[in-house]
Amino acid sequence: MTNPVIIALDFPNWQKTDQFLQQFPKDEALFVKIGMELFYQEGPQLIKTLKARGYRIFLDLKLYDIPNTVQSAMTVIGQLGVDYTTIHAAGGQTMLQAGAAGLKAGAKQANVNPAKLLAITQLTSTNEAQMQQEQLVSVSLPESVAHYAQLAQQSDCDGVICSAQEITTIKSKTATDFLCVTPGIRPATSQNNDQKRAVTPLEAAQMHSNGIVVGRPITQASDPYQAYQAIKLEWESFK
């Protein structure tokens, strides 16, 4: 699964998460995203349970702290054997490099493959006016995202989380194997909710995203498996 469709499991606890997952065939090779709420509620045992079912896991905790703390936390994450995890590019090069080092050290200790480390650039809930007014960033939103992407690559990260609208610029300034994973995916029939730079699965594919993260269009669908299959079909229709 080189370019995955990742389902965001934005549920408050394991009971609701499991109820949702029971609607999928047991042999469906899902790639799921665990965010802060669910991980803080259920802890590392959740990761072990999902891995035992054969799921690939994106642990999205967006680490942002002093370098030593981030390195120690990433060492623990590395031991869990997840596939992707996240860190804030705004933390700077020393923090990013410390996180990458911790992730690899933890994976080595547990004898598992190291996770891909993806840097957060600007959240897809942030528009340019907000960024400039609230963060006192004077450049454009695409320029800020591209800057963070270059910093992430220089700091041992494997890719970034970004809107599909920024992929072309990022890929023009980074290596060919640098990943662009795209949240804020909404089918044409879906409401954008709080994602201000949302695109459809087909648009993301056309913009050469390396993976898409989809939450409510699947988790709140009347038939989640059917919604997942439709999004996956649209995503994979562009070659």
Feature names for model-found ranges:
Residues 2, 69-73, 78-158, 163-166, ...:
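Conserved anion-binding
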Residues 3-9, 32-34, 57-61, 85-87, ...:
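Hydrophobic faces of well-ordered beta-strands that scaffold small-molecule active sites
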Residues 8-12, 35-39, 64-66, 90, ...:
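Active-site beta-loop-alpha junctions enriched in small/polar residues
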Residues 12-24, 68-76, 141-151, 196-203:
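Short, acidic/polar
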Residues 19-27, 45-54, 75-79, 101-112, ...:
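Acidic (Asp/Glu)-rich catalytic clusters
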Residues 29-84:
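Metabolite-binding pocket within alpha/beta catalytic cores that recognizes anionic/polar moieties
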Residues 80-93, 184-187, 195-227:
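Glycine-rich phosphate-binding active-site loops on the catalytic face of alpha/beta enzymes
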